């Protein structure tokens, strides 16, 4: 993930410096004409003060960078429960808005189809001065029967390589064994197809028990 613009969070997460590798990857992808989405795992006390800087980096590298995706940390496998640090979607949104002058909490809303506690998003266009202007703040938000198809079309447009200077900021809170919510699982719009054709909600697919055992092992 693109977790910060300095090395400390990478040492905490990977045990080695990674920033230069990340920056080169962005440069090479941009040179190849690829659309780039920066994905950040948000860890309280490690990089939750870096969110605005990541958005600013994305703004400076438009139109190659099309989005920033924040994922509050989740815990899988065997992990000491007393050492877990949590951050919620509202806290992520508030920190981004506090750390970047062009971003406001009013710009964000939940996904059109998912449970409201699963995901969040906002869309921006860059004006002639370079500022990010919110598009979602003025758009009506309502449930729609064709929401899944609309989201797919919008992502194909937003994350396709182009000279269009637009940026999406969003994220998803993955569930783990300590905070699994069955109501969220029932509303999941991302299903993983098993070898036998069964559909498994995304968070359930990669969920592991407190002992580290996966409920649905294997890729498919």
Task: Pin down the residues of each PLM region.
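Radical SAM/AdoMet-radical enzyme domain recognition
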Residues: 1-72
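Flexible glycine/acidic-rich beta-alpha junction loops that bind and position SAM and/or redox cofactors
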Residues: 8-10, 45, 65-91, 104-128
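A general structural signal for short secondary-structure junctions and capping/turn motifs
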Residues: 57-61, 112-116, 182-183, 191-195
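Glycine- and acidic-residue-rich phosphate-binding/metal-coordinating active-site segment common to enzymes
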Residues: 95
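Short, low-complexity, polar/charged sequence segments that are solvent-exposed and flexible
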Residues: 17-20, 56-59, 86-90, 210-212, ...
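Radical SAM enzyme core and accessory elements
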Residues: 121-220
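Short, solvent-exposed loop/turn segments at secondary-structure junctions
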Residues: 5, 43, 75, 198, ...
């Amino acid at each position: 993930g693109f977790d910060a613009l300095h090395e400390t969070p990478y040492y905490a997460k990977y045990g080695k410096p990674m920033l230069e590798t990340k920056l080169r990857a962005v440069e090479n992808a941009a040179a190849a004409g690829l659309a780039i989405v920066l994905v950040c795992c948000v860890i309280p006390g490690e990089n939750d003060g870096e969110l605005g800087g990541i958005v600013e980096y994305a703004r400076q590298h438009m139109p190659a960078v099309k989005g920033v995706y924040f994922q509050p940390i989740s815990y899988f496998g065997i992990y000491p429960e007393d050492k877990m640090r949590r951050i919620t979607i509202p806290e992520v949104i508030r920190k981004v808005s506090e750390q970047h002058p062009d971003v406001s909490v009013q710009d964000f809303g939940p996904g059109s189809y998912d449970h409201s506690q699963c995901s969040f998003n906002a869309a921006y266009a860059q004006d002639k001065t370079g500022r990010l202007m919110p598009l979602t703040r003025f758009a009506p938000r309502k449930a729609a029967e064709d929401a899944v198809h609309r989201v797919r079309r919008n992502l194909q447009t937003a994350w396709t390589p182009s000279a269009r200077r637009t940026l999406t900021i969003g994220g998803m809170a993955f569930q783990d064994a300590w905070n699994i919510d069955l109501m969220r699982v029932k509303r999941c719009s991302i299903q993983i197809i098993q070898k036998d054709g069964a559909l498994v909600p995304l968070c359930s697919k990669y969920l592991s028990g407190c002992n580290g055992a996966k409920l649905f092992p294997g890729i498919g």
